[in-house]
C-alpha cells in the first residue's frame, strides 16, 4: 500500500511541469530583456526591456520594473540590437506572393555564378519535375557580367528541373524549359532567350498551371523571405490588369510580370489570412487604369470596398498607385484626360491615395491636380501622397506641404542606376532635401518586379547614394542611418492611417519588432557596405515569433 502511494505521488510530481506548461499554452506574452532596444519614439529612447501582452506593447523601459504574468516567455538578448518592425510603404508583395514555380530571390546576388548557386540550392528542395523560377527584382546590372545567364549555365546549375529566369522584360530558360515552352508555340532562342511577347507568353503559360494550393505555397515562401529581413508590414500597391481579365469594362491591359487578374490576385493572401497563417501585415491599395471618363474599374472599387476594411493583419487601405492611365508625354504637356475626374471621385468617397511618378513633370502635374482636388474636397485628413519622386522643385514641395500631402520615396535607382536622370542632377529620390523641408516623408522599395525587396539594401542606398555597381549616383541626398531607419519605421504608418499603431516600440502599439544580427547604428561594427548584410535573428509580429534565427 505504501509503495502504491509513493508511486502515485511520484507520478503526480512528474506531471506538474506538463500541467503548468499546458496552463500557459494560451499565452502570447513575450518579454525581451538585456537588449539595446531602439524604440524610434519621439524621444528616440534606447531601453533594455520590452514586454508584449495580448499582441500589444505593455512595457518599455529598464529591466525589472514591470510586473509580469507567470506565463510570460522571456528571451535574454545578451546585448543585441532591437528595432521596430520595418514597414515598406510601397511594394508589390501580392505579385511576389503568387509567382509560379518554386521562386528564388536572386536580388542579393552579385554575379551569375552566385545566382546559379542559389538556383541549385533551391532545386534540392523541390519536387521532381517542378519549375524553379526567379522572376523580377533584379536586372543584368546586378551581376558583374552585366548580362542574363545562358541556357548552358542554367542547365549546369539545374539540369533536372525546368527553369524560368526573368526580369522586367527579357527572360531565359534551360533545356527542359525550352522544350515545354516550344510545345506551347512560344519561340525560344537557341541560347534559351525569351524576348518581348515570348517572355510574357511564357509567364502566362506558367501561371495557367497554378492551383490555389500552389499560390498559397508561394505566398508562404514570400512572407518567410521578408520576415528574415525584419519587414513586418507591406503596403501593397496592386497590379496592372492582365490581358483576358474578366469584367474590366475598359480595354486597358498591360501584360508582363507586373500584371495579373485584378480580381483573383489576392486569393492566396486571403487564404492565409482565413487560415490564420498570415504572418506579415499587408495593407492593400487598389490600382485603376481606366481609359474612359466613365472610370468603370475605379468606380467598382470605390462602391464595393470600404476604406480601412479588415483587421490588423490584412486591411484595404487606399487607392493607388494609379487611378487612370499614366503612359503620357508629361514633359510635352500630354496628360491623362480623366485624371482629375478620377481623383475627385477618390476624394469624394474619402479614400487615401498615392500616385506613382517617375519624372519632375509627373510630380508637378500630380501636385497641380492634388491642389485642384483639395479646393473641392480637402485632402489633408486623407493622407494623400506622391510616390517615387526622382526629382522635385522647391515650389512643389511647399505647395504639397501646405495641403498635407506626403512623399513616399523608393530606391529603385539602386538597380536601375542613373539612366534617365537629367544631366548633372542626382538620380534621386531627394531624400535629404525632402526630409529637411519638413514635409512628411517615408520610405519603401517599389519591389515585386523592378526593385530590391530586402529593406537593408534600400537603406544602404539611402545612406550611401551608391547603386548596385558601387557608383555614387545620388550625391548630396544621403541621410543618416537613424533617419533612414525612421523613414522605414516610425514615419511610414502615416501613409495608411496607422501611425498610432505601428512603426515604433511604445506602450499601446502593436507588438512588432526585430532583433538584428549586428549593431546597425554603430559604423565601427557595421560599415556602410555591411548594412547590406543586416538581417533579423528574431522577428515578432503582434507578440508572435514569426521568424526565429536564434535557435
Name what the model sees in each region.
Residues 5-15:
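Bacterial N-terminal signal peptides
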Residues 16-20:
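Sec/Tat signal peptide C-region and signal peptidase I cleavage site
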Residues 23-33, 38, 42-301, 313-344, ...:
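Divalent metal-binding segments
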Residues 37, 57, 64-65, 80, ...:
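Short, glycine-/Ser/Thr-/acidic-enriched flexible segments
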Residues 177, 293-305, 363-376, 399:
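Distinct, well-ordered alpha-helical segments
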Residues 217, 344-384, 388-389, 394, ...:
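His/Asp/Glu-enriched, well-ordered alpha-helical/loop segment
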Residues 399-405:
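A short, structured beta-strand-centered segment in the mid-to-C-terminal lobe
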Amino acid at each position: 500500500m505504501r509503495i502504491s502511494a509513493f508511486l502515485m505521488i511520484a507520478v503526480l510530481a512528474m506531471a506538474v511541469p506538463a500541467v503548468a506548461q499546458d496552463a500557459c499554452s494560451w499565452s502570447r506574452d513575450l518579454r525581451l530583456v538585456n537588449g539595446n532596444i531602439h524604440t524610434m519614439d519621439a524621444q528616440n529612447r534606447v531601453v533594455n526591456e520590452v514586454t508584449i501582452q495580448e499582441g500589444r506593447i505593455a512595457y518599455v523601459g529598464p529591466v525589472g520594473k514591470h510586473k509580469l504574468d507567470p506565463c510570460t516567455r522571456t528571451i535574454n538578448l545578451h546585448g543585441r540590437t532591437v528595432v521596430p518592425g520595418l514597414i515598406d510603404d510601397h511594394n508589390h508583395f501580392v505579385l511576389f506572393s503568387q509567382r509560379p514555380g518554386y521562386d528564388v530571390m536572386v536580388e542579393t546576388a552579385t554575379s551569375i555564378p552566385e545566382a546559379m548557386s542559389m538556383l541549385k540550392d533551391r532545386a534540392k528542395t523541390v519536387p521532381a519535375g517542378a519549375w524553379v523560377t526567379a522572376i523580377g527584382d533584379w536586372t543584368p546590372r546586378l551581376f558583374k557580367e552585366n548580362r542574363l545567364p545562358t541556357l548552358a549555365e542554367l542547365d549546369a546549375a539545374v539540369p533536372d528541373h525546368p527553369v524560368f529566369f526573368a526580369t522586367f522584360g527579357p527572360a531565359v530558360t534551360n533545356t527542359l524549359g525550352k522544350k515545354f515552352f516550344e510545345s506551347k508555340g512560344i519561340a525560344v532562342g537557341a541560347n534559351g532567350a525569351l524576348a518581348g511577347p515570348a517572355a510574357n507568353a511564357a509567364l502566362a503559360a506558367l501561371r495557367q498551371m497554378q492551383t490555389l494550393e500552389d499560390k498559397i505555397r508561394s505566398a508562404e515562401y514570400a512572407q518567410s523571405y521578408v520576415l528574415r529581413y525584419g519587414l513586418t508590414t507591406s503596403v501593397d500597391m496592386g497590379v496592372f490588369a492582365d490581358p483576358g481579365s474578366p469584367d474590366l469594362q475598359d480595354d486597358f491591359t498591360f501584360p508582363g510580370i507586373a500584371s495579373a487578374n485584378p480580381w483573383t490576385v489576392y486569393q492566396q493572401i486571403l487564404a492565409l489570412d482565413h487560415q490564420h497563417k498570415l504572418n506579415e501585415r499587408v495593407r492593400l491599395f487598389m490600382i485603376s487604369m481606366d481609359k474612359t471618363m466613365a472610370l468603370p474599374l475605379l468606380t467598382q472599387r470605390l462602391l464595393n470596398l470600404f476604406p480601412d476594411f479588415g483587421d490588423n493583419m490584412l486591411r484595404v487601405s487606399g487607392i493607388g498607385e494609379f487611378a487612370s492611365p499614366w503612359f503620357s508625354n508629361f514633359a510635352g504637356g500630354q496628360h491623362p484626360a480623366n485624371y482629375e475626374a478620377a481623383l475627385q471621385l477618390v476624394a469624394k468617397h474619402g479614400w487615401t491615395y498615392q500616385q506613382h511618378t517617375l519624372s519632375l513633370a509627373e510630380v508637378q502635374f500630380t501636385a497641380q491636380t492634388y491642389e485642384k482636388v483639395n479646393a473641392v474636397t480637402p485632402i489633408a485628413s486623407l493622407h494623400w501622397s506622391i510616390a517615387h519622386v526622382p526629382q522635385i522643385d522647391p515650389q512643389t514641395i511647399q505647395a504639397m506641404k501646405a495641403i498635407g500631402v506626403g512623399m513616399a520615396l523608393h530606391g529603385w535607382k539602386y538597380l536601375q542606376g542613373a539612366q534617365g536622370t537629367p544631366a548633372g542632377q542626382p538620380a534621386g529620390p531627394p531624400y535629404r532635401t525632402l526630409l529637411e523641408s519638413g514635409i512628411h516623408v517615408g520610405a519603401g522599395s517599389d519591389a515585386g518586379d523592378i526593385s530590391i525587396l530586402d529593406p537593408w539594401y534600400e537603406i544602404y542606398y539611402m545612406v550611401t547614394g551608391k547603386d548596385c555597381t558601387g557608383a555614387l549616383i545620388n550625391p548630396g541626398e544621403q541621410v543618416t542611418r537613424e533617419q533612414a531607419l525612421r523613414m522605414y519605421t516610425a514615419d511610414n504608418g502615416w501613409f495608411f492611417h496607422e501611425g498610432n499603431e505601428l512603426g515604433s516600440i511604445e506602450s499601446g502599439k502593436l507588438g512588432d519588432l526585430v532583433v538584428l544580427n549586428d549593431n546597425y547604428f554603430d559604423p565601427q561594427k557595421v560599415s556602410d557596405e555591411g548594412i547590406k548584410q543586416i538581417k533579423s535573428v528574431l522577428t515578432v509580429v503582434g507578440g508572435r515569433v514569426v521568424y526565429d534565427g536564434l535557435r
